[in-house]
């Protein structure tokens, strides 16, 4: 027999961002607890609001299965001494099964007598086992925790009640000074407490008390109400998923409403308005049918429609106060030229151990000018880069960014545009922060992409030079994200940048031109280059490349992300082709022969030492590949050459007795292997 089991932890209001993760954690830990205690169940449903974390275990077994099994122990000669007395090994074996040594008997197995016990144990009742759920509560972890009253225990918020019902029966789980019962709390202002008769009454009983405990249902209500409101006014809305999730976890009974503000505030940049509404007030911004921001917002109340006009008025007043501040900052900042803010960069610290923002901008210009030549930017683009690299951090000391830090770069773009800077310069100020998240949008302009790469590369070089290198578990300055951003931009722009070559050259360029400490020596340069290169794996994984393809291309000595990606594309594309297996096997055979022969000093191949036409054919084939740059073309050439390679092995003894012939043939194979290594370490490919 089975019954449903309800377990609710009632708390003070939790921060919205922890609710979903916390209820998932509760479900995972509860499921683990039940499995470890031998209780089967169909599934675990989760319910959550800011005031409760709940699991409903469907079809939970009433008891553990009875145990009736034979356990094998040590051999008889170990279980008993010469006088027939039980040894410690025997006593320990029996005790481990909940038995005594007197319960041991012996049976022969393959000519050897072993100790056995027959274990028979009645399974425990589910109600008895569930009393141990206090351990689940104790095991839960949170980003921040609180203590309350005189308790020494910490939880995400103080716990005020517990509900534990197995079917209709209370399971009196005890935690601190609380004993679980069948009484739960309705909405803080609209509902009353509820006495649950049965675990399955939970959802509907709380609905009657203005609590929608199903987070998915609550979210659907919000979306439906928003759509009704938007359609009735002929508006448009960008339904931000993360904001919707946050708002959903702020309410127990959602009611959507719209508010408005004076049109004069539309004169400030859209991003300021959106930040004020979305980030500060948790409002959804509203657009007209042409996609233009209008002076309205949508929000969600934790309650019903009673006195909704007062709620709307209160929210409008709060937003207007915020917007008045924004207008003041905007007007104050525009009183000064950009040079006024740039002059203050000397007093803005990038990092105590590295130097000022002014010094950083100087380094970034040097790096960017070097990269611009490699990337082939036009003279106009280089001029725009030189201009923007001398001012791009200026908005950090504006009043607007001082109040709205999330607008750094954005306000710089707007202020630069107002000051008459061209579009390339203005937009690059915003784009140099991109991508702002691991998979965020990339710069759309060449100048912005160059500035972003140069700025991120400088940051990584500076922190490595100062000895602040990320560990496997700690990256406080997000250097891995910066490195991944560099890789994504390079690949998006199809810019070639072999890190092993570029890093030492940049460090040399910066030497003597900055007070910041730089990486010292080839070993530190390599460590830094490898750190950035390692982010290519993240890119390939994100783009669903097969694990063996990733292993193969990253095992090569290639440092240029564009070349590594090109190789990965070819191997991925042809991985399941009929020709792939024989080609890879032939090339891998060559690599293995060279490795076994410990052959590393290849000499130019001497055709005069050839003894068979197959050697000349392979020589001609390799010569034809010497100038092939495209990886796809290289692979196709290997497919065409595969028969030649096989004939070469069929006819020729590689390890010939004649030393000159042997070395010549190994040199031939080394020439093939050098070309194959452009595709990666093919031995790591899994071929069938």
Swiss-Prot record:
It comes from the Bacteria. Its main location: cytoplasm. InterPro entries: Gly-tRNA-synth_bsu (IPR015944), Gly-tRNA-synth_heterodimer (IPR006194). It catalyses: tRNA(Gly) + glycine + ATP = glycyl-tRNA(Gly) + AMP + diphosphate. Transmembrane segments: none annotated. Its EC number is 6.1.1.14. Pfam families: tRNA_synt_2f. GO terms for biological process: glycyl-tRNA aminoacylation. GO terms for molecular function: ATP binding; glycine-tRNA ligase activity. It is found in: Cytoplasm. One of its GO terms (cellular component) is cytosol. Keywords: Aminoacyl-tRNA synthetase, ATP-binding, Cytoplasm, Ligase, Nucleotide-binding, Protein biosynthesis. The keyword Transferase does not apply. PANTHER family: GLYCINE--TRNA LIGASE, CHLOROPLASTIC_MITOCHONDRIAL 2, GLYCYL-TRNA SYNTHETASE. HAMAP family: Gly_tRNA_synth_beta. Belongs to the class-II aminoacyl-tRNA synthetase family. Tetramer of two alpha and two beta subunits. This is Glycine--tRNA ligase beta subunit. It comes from Lactobacillus delbrueckii subsp. bulgaricus (strain ATCC BAA-365 / Lb-18). The gene is glyS.
